């Protein structure tokens, strides 16, 4: 037996965790012996080789989210060791490490701001002020033994130390709810510092904080480039040196003449200052930074998740001339990131790179990013200094597959690279089967997840780049089945807590940014609901995201951390349910527990309701919200009861379950007729009632048959919007219509998943149909992950891996393929290790192979109904 994948806060050897919060630990077991289970563990933590925490021997199989000491010392390197005993009498020990960050009480640095006069930002390319160079020189008289830098800014920054980047992170300090949460980063600079002069350099662009669409909704805010950093050095001679952002910080305009997180970046190489962040540079004409006394250290928090980095580089597939004479570069894949170009141009010559997702019907440039915010240009411009250079923007990113290029004569594909950006995450799963279209659908989901998990979970990486709560509320489970997003979602949920209102309601987007904050107020005024408003299915993220994390990984720590926030939203939902709908004829005891008032999005983007004039939007939302609102209201209260029970909050568990039961009764009374049919003959209504168990047992098959009739009447095509689609195929299976579920999965006529694949999609689209009849793309996003939730169904039903307990500790391996599929493979990295299942039809037999990790049991069900209960090990079974 051996141990691997040791982690603290779900990260390997993390640098700079919060010393004020209880850390959690994890490890995994490997053993050649079958049926291996952990019997006990002992966790020890060392500081300066002295044991500061010892759990003693703990008799449990738990090996993930194991809580450590309540408090740790700040700025301290810790070594930790875990000893594990298994059920075969063996034991082994493994070690790892972590380090705590600067505590909130230890900040001595000053906020230092650019000295230029404030420039109000306006939307549009090139309208922003230049990025700012912040330079802090200092001298060391002794060699550093240990050096840690803690840094952040208002805007986004790129750090250099003596001209070198300590890591390759992008967009630090990233996107959070700035009014109450600003992350800082921890860097190990030990190897980058030396005796003599040293220079810290921070180049700061506008980022999210200074952008008019995404700046925090704070009255009177005048956002501009501001830095805060503190360098703590332990010298080899035993002395200590501290270097802070202070009056010694000098500033200068950058060669980045304008940068906007949406519209793009303008860079003039003629204005670059080579060596500005190196010792020996003359900064005589630089201006001192100005101390900003308005900023507070109270919002500072050490970054919990991993950084945004380049996760992949894609070479251009081809360069062609469009019918309009444009130079078009095709990378073959829709991504989030930016383009890199290598050129050799005369001084003053400019290269323009316009990023876009889809060409028009004839292959010309087409800007599909047009919204209430106006047209987003997604443009980067590079002005040459006359030397050969490789250009890549620094403080922006785009959603694109294509470039329209101006200013490069006779370009070739080798000059262009697509730099794919995303938050760094560990892959957690794979899927492949005999149907190539389903494989492409799976890959499309993975690409959309990559693009929309850049600092925060977004709806799209080009038009809005916003943390729409509804998207991640629905997609969180699928995300966890694809990648380790535990640190990522933990960080985002912290912003959700900051933005949650006093009454418990949740904004449309987290972080709550200006454009959607004020849109929420406006929507409230337009609908007479007051504002800012929220919606069922969207605000639910406060409950559904932490619950998805718990259900997939067994993470009880996140339930503890988010518990008050979860209760806040549920109590808000219950308070809304108490408000009776105008002109309601329902009995008071029903209305009292039915959420059917207020602003609501409803299903959202139902195909048969798509394309309606703007003035009909609220009408179509009301049509479907009549059932989505009470159903999703019940769902979060039901899940809240489950969370309370898991944490041993018995009084809360009883209270919320009693309310959920009353809501369930009210939903049945309001939505189901005496004849056993729904008052709303829509696919989405039947889907939600079936999948959440809201249908009386005696009527389940009847509801399944009715749902099938509605689908058949629609040409065997789906007609579900945003909220019901993730549950569509499961609802059909519950209602005894598995064959129809496969029919919908394989459907190639729009609206359907494979219609997109057949149309050449490389990501998941915002709407089911993204092209006009003449082939012209719609002005919508080609990169939204939410409809990719179908992957979850494929993983379970085709791949065969499901769970019978939280955290996949007890597996159910039960492939249920239709006759057209001949083989499939699925792997998933659980908290215990890798589960791998493959099956194939060969020679009249169904042959299944399974690898079960240690600390796990599985019930394997073959297509003929044969069942096998097994422990860890390798198995081959057939029928």
Question: Locations of the language-model features?
Answer:
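Alpha-helical support elements that line or immediately flank enzyme active sites
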Residues: 148-151, 338-357, 392, 406, ...
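Active-site acid/base region of carbohydrate-active enzymes
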Residues: 156, 226-228, 246-253, 412-443, ...
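Acidic, mature catalytic/reactive cores of soluble proteins
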Residues: 347-362, 420, 432, 439, ...
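Non-transmembrane amphipathic alpha-helical segments
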Residues: 546, 634-637, 641-644
């Amino acid at each position: 037996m051996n141990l691997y994948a040791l982690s603290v806060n779900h990260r390997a050897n993390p640098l700079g965790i919060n010393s004020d919060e209880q850390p959690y630990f994890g490890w995994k077991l490997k053993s050649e012996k079958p049926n291996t289970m952990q019997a006990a563990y002992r966790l020890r933590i060392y500081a300066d080789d002295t044991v500061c925490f010892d759990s003693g021997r703990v008799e449990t199989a738990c090996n993930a989210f194991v809580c450590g000491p309540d408090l740790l010392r700040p700025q301290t390197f810790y070594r930790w060791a875990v000893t594990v005993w298994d059920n075969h009498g063996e034991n082994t020990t493994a070690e790892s490490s972590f380090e705590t960050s600067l505590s909130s009480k230890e900040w001595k640095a000053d906020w230092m701001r650019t000295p230029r006069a404030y420039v109000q930002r306006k939307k549009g390319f090139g309208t922003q002020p230049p990025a700012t160079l912040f330079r802090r020189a200092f001298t060391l008289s002794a060699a550093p033994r240990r050096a840690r830098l803690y840094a952040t800014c208002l805007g986004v920054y790129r750090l250099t130390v003596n001209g070198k980047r300590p890591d390759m992170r992008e967009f630090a300090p990233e996107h959070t709810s700035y009014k109450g949460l600003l992350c800082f980063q921890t860097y190990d600079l030990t190897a980058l510092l030396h005796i003599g002069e040293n220079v810290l350099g921070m180049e700061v662009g506008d980022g999210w904080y200074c952008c008019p669409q995404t700046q925090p909704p704070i009255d009177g805010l005048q956002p501009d480039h501001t830095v805060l950093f503190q360098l703590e050095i332990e010298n080899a001679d035993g002395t200590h040196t501290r270097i802070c952002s202070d009056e010694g910080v000098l500033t200068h305009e950058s060669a980045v003449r304008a940068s906007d997180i949406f519209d793009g970046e303008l860079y003039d190489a003629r204005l670059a200052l080579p060596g500005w962040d190196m010792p020996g540079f003359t900064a005589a004409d630089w201006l001192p930074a100005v101390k900003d006394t308005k900023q507070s250290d109270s919002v500072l928090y050490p970054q919990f998740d991993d950084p945004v980095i380049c996760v992949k580089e894609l070479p251009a597939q081809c360069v062609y001339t469009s019918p309009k004479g444009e130079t078009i570069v095709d990378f073959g894949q829709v991504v989030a990131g930016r383009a890199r170009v290598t050129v050799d141009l005369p001084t003053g010559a400019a290269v323009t790179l316009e990023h876009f997702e889809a060409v028009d019907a004839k292959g010309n440039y087409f800007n599909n990013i047009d919204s209430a915010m106006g047209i987003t240009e997604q443009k980067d411009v590079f002005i040459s200094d006359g030397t050969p250079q490789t250009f890549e923007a620094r403080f922006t990113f785009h959603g694109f597959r294509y470039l329209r290029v101006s200013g490069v004569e006779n370009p070739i594909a080798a000059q262009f690279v697509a730099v794919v950006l995303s938050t760094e995450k560990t892959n957690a799963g794979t899927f492949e089967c005999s149907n190539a279209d389903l494989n492409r659908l799976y890959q499309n989901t993975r690409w959309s997840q990559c693009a929309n998990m850049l600092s925060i979970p977004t709806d799209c990486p080009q038009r809005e780049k916003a943390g729409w709560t509804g998207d991640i509320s629905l997609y969180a489970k699928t995300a966890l089945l694809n990648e380790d997003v535990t640190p990522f979602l933990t960080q985002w949920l912290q912003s959700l807590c900051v933005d949650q209102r006093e009454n418990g309601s949740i904004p449309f987007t987290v972080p709550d940014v200006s454009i959607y904050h004020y849109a929420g107020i406006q929507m409230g005024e337009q609908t007479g609901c007051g504002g800012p408003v929220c919606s069922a299915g969207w605000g639910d993220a406060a409950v559904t995201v932490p619950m998805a994390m718990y259900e997939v990984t067994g993470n009880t720590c996140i339930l503890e951390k988010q518990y008050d926030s979860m209760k806040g939203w549920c109590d808000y939902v219950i308070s809304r349910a108490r408000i009776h709908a105008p002109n309601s004829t329902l009995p008071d005891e029903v209305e009292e527990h039915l959420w059917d008032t207020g602003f609501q999005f409803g299903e959202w983007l139902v195909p048969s309701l798509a394309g309606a004039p703007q003035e009909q939007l609220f009408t179509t939302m009301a049509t479907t919200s009549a059932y989505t609102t009470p159903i999703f209201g019940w769902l979060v209260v039901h899940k809240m009861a489950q969370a309370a029970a898991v944490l041993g909050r018995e009084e809360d568990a009883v209270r919320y379950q009693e309310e959920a039961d009353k809501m369930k009764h009210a939903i049945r009374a309001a939505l189901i007729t005496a004849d056993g049919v729904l008052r709303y003959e829509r696919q989405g209504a039947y889907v939600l009632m079936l999948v959440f168990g809201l249908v009386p047992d005696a009527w389940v098959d009847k509801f399944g048959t009715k749902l099938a009739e509605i689908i058949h009447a629609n040409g065997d095509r789906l007609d579900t919007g945003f909220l019901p689609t993730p549950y569509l195929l499961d609802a059909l299976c519950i209602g005894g219509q598995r064959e129809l579920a496969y029919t919908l999965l394989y459907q190639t006529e729009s609206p359907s998943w494979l219609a997109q694949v057949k149309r050449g999609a490389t990501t998941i689209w915002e709407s089911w149909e993204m092209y006009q009849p003449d082939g012209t793309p719609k002005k919508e996003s080609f990169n939204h992950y939410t409809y990719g939730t179908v992957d979850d169904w494929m993983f379970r039903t085709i791949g065969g891996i499901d769970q019978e307990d939280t955290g996949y500790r007890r597996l159910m391996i039960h492939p249920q393929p239709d006759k057209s599929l001949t083989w499939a493979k699925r792997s998933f990295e659980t908290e215990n290790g890798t589960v791998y299942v493959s099956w194939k039809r060969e020679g009249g037999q169904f042959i299944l192979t399974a690898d079960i990790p240690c600390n796990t049991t599985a019930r394997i069900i073959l297509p003929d109904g044969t069942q096998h209960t097994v422990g860890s090990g390798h198995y081959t079974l057939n029928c």
